[in-house]
Amino acid sequence: AMQRWNLHRRVAIGLIGLLGTKPSAIIAGFLMASALVSMWVSNTATALMMLPIALSVVQLLPERAHQTREVQGFSTALLLSVAYGATTGGMGTLIGTPPNALLAGYIADIHDVTIGFGQWMLIGVPVVLVALPAVYVVLTRIMFTLDAGELPGMAELIKAEKAAQGRMGRAEIAVAVVF
């Protein structure tokens, strides 16, 4: 639904406009957004929801830029940030990923110890808060060197895209409310 009404494109443009056009800032935004959503929605569903948004960011890049090594590294890091952010965020709550609930059920059955939602979060959220910066450093400093400045032509492209989009339609609003 997000793709049908181009809401994913609007979200991507808004996210970049908010965070700036530096690759490392965009990676941080996608990591945090994926992790936050994944704490309350299955990590698989989160990745499926965020992937079209990340792909639309990659598609916003000028065609000539796709051939540079920096942009290829950014594109790969961006897609990995969705996957890693969703996986990391899913550890934060019982409902973030199905194995969490399975583990809680197993512990309740075998050891007669009940782990509540809040109890899980007392351990899970600090783990997420420590893991996310580590993932960010790995993606932006170790695997890919992304602080080479802003993406070429991205600021002008964002302005043009925002102007071309206009106001949100009813269908976009309905999809945004559902998600």
Model-derived regions: residue spans:
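Membrane-embedded alpha-helical segments and adjacent helix-loop junctions characteristic
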Residues: 1-69
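Juxtamembrane and boundary regions of transmembrane helices in multi-pass small-molecule transporters
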Residues: 4-10, 43, 61-103, 109-167, ...
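Transmembrane helical segments that form the transport core of multi-pass membrane transport proteins
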Residues: 30, 174-179
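Residues on a specific face of well-ordered alpha-helices
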Residues: 52-55, 101, 105
